Amino acid sequence: MSDELPAGATTHVDGVGYSLSATVLESRDANAHADFYRRLLGWTTIDEEPGWVILRPPGGGSGLSFSTDELYEPPVWPAQPGAQQMQDHLDIHVDDLSAAVERALACGATLAEYQPQDDVRVLVDPAGHLFCHFES
């Protein structure tokens, strides 16, 4: 990957350097899934091929990768016994929670029925992955 990471993004443990490149999200259509986050976050596509897309923020750093899995099943949340379980979610800091939620909905997200915190909004992307918007 040719994008440079920001200074300090690499840690060294026992002589080995580590830097998080991306979090990978699977769906039945990686290209459509990536398009949602491209529009939502304003990130740049740095690699795209059938079934695989990599997005990075304009300033560099770790990003999101998207992989097609034809057997992907969206999670059920809150969790229910016997249903597909959520394995991860994205926490996205925003500086205006109401405006960010409105924008996410306009991009194609839905508001999750269950909202466990007053200062966080749980949303669902078009592929069924949960993500949270929060202010600090």
Regions found by a protein language model. Name each.
Residues 2-21, 43-91, 101-125, 136:
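Vicinal oxygen chelate
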Residues 133:
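Short glycine-/small-residue motifs
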Residues 95, 129:
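Conserved Rossmann-like nucleotide-cofactor binding loop
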Residues 33, 37-38, 104, 128:
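Conserved active-site tyrosine of GNAT-family acetyltransferases
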